[in-house]
Every structure is written in structure tokens, then in C-alpha cells.
From Swiss-Prot:
Keywords: Cytoplasm, Magnesium, Metal-binding, Pantothenate biosynthesis, Transferase. The keyword Transferase applies. HAMAP family: PanB. GO terms for cellular component: cytoplasm. Its EC number is 2.1.2.11. It comes from Prochlorococcus marinus (strain MIT 9303). This is 3-methyl-2-oxobutanoate hydroxymethyltransferase. InterPro entries: Pantoate_hydroxy_MeTrfase (IPR003700), Pyrv/PenolPyrv_kinase-like_dom (IPR015813), Pyrv_kinase-like_dom_sf (IPR040442). It catalyses: 3-methyl-2-oxobutanoate + (6R)-5,10-methylene-5,6,7,8-tetrahydrofolate + H2O = 2-dehydropantoate + (6S)-5,6,7,8-tetrahydrofolate. Its cofactor is Mg(2+). Homodecamer; pentamer of dimers. Binds 1 Mg(2+) ion per subunit. One of its GO terms (molecular function) is magnesium ion binding.
Length: 272
């Protein structure tokens, strides 16, 4: 899967599926599920590294986890999902050269074929244009942007006409800057539908209704592995509970075997 193929999927009316992965095991599961795109999201800061937000994760850590994702795939390269890697906080907000170095490192030394950036500020648009000129595909991200948690929080975005008009303008700017797709998170379905209709590039929703060109989800949330999930991403199974019960069963069985062994007739020790 190549970035340019996602636009064709939109034109064909086929929903685009994106799931996150953070190591080889999760990558193998997502690949087997048939997802079009694997996102190595900076959400791994919380899912895999137990941070409270996405902010602490570094470029080096993103590279480490993306390399692990690549090793988890089992299919030949042409049949593998497209891998998009998040550029973490302050890896692209501090200048174009730093952004090019970070994105270039991810594409050179891992299976990533594209990067994702949050926001549409003038500085971010300039970075996107520079990356695209350098041959690095870029996915945009508007709405709830976790890297801006201290400014915006986790509340739903674009709820009034003024902010919706601003989002539409920003989305068009991102498309013009060269983004091949756009993620919109935790926004009303009406604005997501409008974006999908007015943009040529695919609009991928998470908590943005069902009228987008595709959907992205954090795999650990869908599997119920995280302690809690966002209201717009309910779990499909209670994976955390199932795993704990299975491991508890093993521990219990081990203890029972030990108790049984102590109550049986002892056998003479063999000569060593």
C-alpha cells in the first residue's frame, strides 16, 4: 500500500482502515486483520511506556518501536500495510531542518513510509511543504490534537460555526501543502462530512462520525487492553479482563500442582 493509493480508495468508495501498532506482536495482529494502514502513533507513550500523555515520547523511541513493528510483519513488502509514524512533540515545531532530520531518520531506518503531524499553524504548514518537497509523504491531523493537551485538553473540537469554518480552511491548507490524507479527531460528524466532501484527499475519522473516508483506532482501546477508553472508541472485547483471567488461571494451576506434589508419597532421591 502506497500513500497515493488511499486517494484511489476514496474515489472507489471503499472505507480506509487504520489501526495502531507499537511492537512486533501488535503489528502481526493488525496485519492479519487486514488493515490498510498501520499507524505507529505517539499514543504508544501511554499504551506501551505508561506515560500520562503523548508528550514525553522521543524520536529515538518512535524509531525503536517502528523498527519493531516492521519486524512483526509476515507478508512480503508489497503486501504489507502502509506504515505511518507520528512525529512526536517538538520534533517538528522547532524548525524545518529538525523536522526533516526526524522524519528522514524514521523513513531511512525503519519500515515507515510516511509521517503524521498535528495542527495547521503557519510553521507546521511550512514544515509539511518542506517534507513533501524532500519526498516524505505527510498525513495531517486536526481536531483533538493530543500534543496540544495543555492548551486544548481532550474536549471535543469545532463545535461552533466559527471554529468549523476555521477547520475547513485549515484542512484545505493542509491539502494544498501536500498532505496525502487527513485525520480528524473528536469533532462533530457534520464538519467531518463537510471535509470529506470538499477535500480530494481522504479524511480519516476517530470520534468524527461515520461519514468519513475511513476510520482510525488505537488497537489497544479496541481490544479493551487499556484501563479506560475514550467515549468515541469503545472496546470490542474486554481483552484486559480476559488476559488477567487467563494468567490467574495459570498461577492457580501452578499453585495447585505444587500443593499436590507435597501431599503425594515422597520418592527416594536418585543418586547424582
Amino acid at each position: 500500500m502506497r500513500p497515493s493509493e488511499l486517494t484511489q480508495l476514496k474515489q472507489d468508495g471503499r472505507a480506509i482502515s487504520i489501526l495502531t501498532a507499537w511492537d512486533g506482536l501488535s503489528a502481526a495482529l493488525v496485519e492479519a486483520a487486514g488493515a490498510d494502514v498501520v499507524l505507529v502513533g505517539d499514543s504508544l507513550a501511554m499504551v506501551a511506556l505508561c506515560h500520562a500523555t503523548t508528550l514525553p515520547v522521543t524520536v529515538e523511541q518512535m524509531l525503536h518501536h517502528t523498527q519493531a513493528v516492521g519486524r512483526g510483519f509476515t507478508r512480503p513488502l508489497p503486501q504489507q500495510p502502509l506504515v505511518v509514524c507520528d512525529l512526536p512533540f517538538l520534533s517538528y515545531q522547532c524548525g524545518e531542518d529538525k523536522a526533516v532530520a526526524a522524519a528522514g531518520s524514521l523513513l531511512k531506518h525503519s519500515c515507515a513510509a510516511a509521517v503524521k503531524l498535528e495542527g495547521a499553524e503557519p510553521e507546521v504548514l511550512a514544515v509539511i511543504e518542506r517534507l513533501v518537497r524532500m519526498g516524505i509523504p505527510v498525513m495531517g491531523h486536526l481536531g483533538l490534537t493530543p500534543q496540544a493537551v495543555h492548551r486544548l485538553g481532550y474536549r471535543r473540537q469545532a463545535e461552533d460555526p466559527r471554529s468549523q469554518a476555521q477547520m475547513l480552511q485549515q484542512a484545505k491548507q493542509l491539502e494544498q501543502a501536500g498532505c496525502f490524507a487527513l485525520v480528524v479527531e473528536h469533532v462533530p460528524s457534520s464538519i467531518a462530512r463537510c471535509l470529506s466532501q470538499q477535500l480530494t484527499i481522504p479524511v480519516i475519522g476517530i470520534g468524527a462520525g461515520e461519514d468519513c473516508d475511513g476510520q482510525v483506532r488505537v488497537t489497544a482501546d479496541l481490544l479493551g487492553l487499556t484501563p479506560s477508553q475514550p467515549p468515541f472508541s469503545p472496546p470490542l472485547i474486554q481483552g484486559r479482563q480476559l488476559c488477567v483471567e487467563a494468567l490467574q488461571g495459570w498461577v492457580k494451576q501452578l499453585h495447585q500442582q505444587a500443593e499436590t506434589a507435597t501431599t503425594t508419597t515422597s520418592q527416594p532421591e536418585p543418586d547424582c
